[in-house]
């Protein structure tokens, strides 16, 4: 069963530091943790001109960057409004034990 825990506080109050510690602690206990970080800015992983950027610009719904040790998934939603946290979580992998927001 997946659990969701939200952290709320002023900037600089230690939310990220606490989350880092909890991720390590939960991982040591064999649990998988995902995180959601809200940003007030557009999220850009790619660099203009790179293949993955070009695929996204062409209209690909998902672009997956894969290397020997990692995978990064970027989805593009054509939305006019901000996604609710419930909508975000519904799009995430459901095989984790905890999601920290």
PLM region spans:
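Post-Walker A alpha-helix
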Residues: 18-19
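Conserved lysine of the Walker
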Residues: 15
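Phosphate-binding/switch loop-helix module in NTP-utilizing enzymes
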Residues: 76-101
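N-terminal phosphate/diphosphate-binding loop that engages ATP/GTP or pyrophosphate donors
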Residues: 23-80
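Walker A (P-loop) ATP-phosphate-binding motif of ABC ATPase nucleotide-binding domains
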Residues: 4
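Hydrophobic anchor at the beta1->P-loop junction of P-loop NTPases
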Residues: 7
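The conserved Walker
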Residues: 11
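Short loop/turn elements that form and flank the Walker-type P-loop nucleotide-binding site
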Residues: 1, 59-60, 94-95
């Amino acid at each position: 069963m997946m659990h969701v825990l939200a952290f709320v506080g002023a900037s600089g109050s230690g939310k990220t530091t606490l989350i880092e510690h909890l991720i390590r602690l939960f991982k040591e206990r064999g649990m998988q943790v995902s995180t959601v970080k809200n940003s007030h800015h557009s999220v850009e992983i790619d660099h203009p001109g790179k293949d993955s950027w070009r695929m996204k610009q062409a209209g690909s719904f998902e672009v997956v960057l894969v290397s020997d040790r990692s995978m990064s998934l970027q989805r593009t939603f054509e939305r006019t409004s901000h996604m609710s946290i419930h909508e975000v979580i519904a799009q995430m992998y459901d095989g984790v034990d905890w999601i920290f927001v």
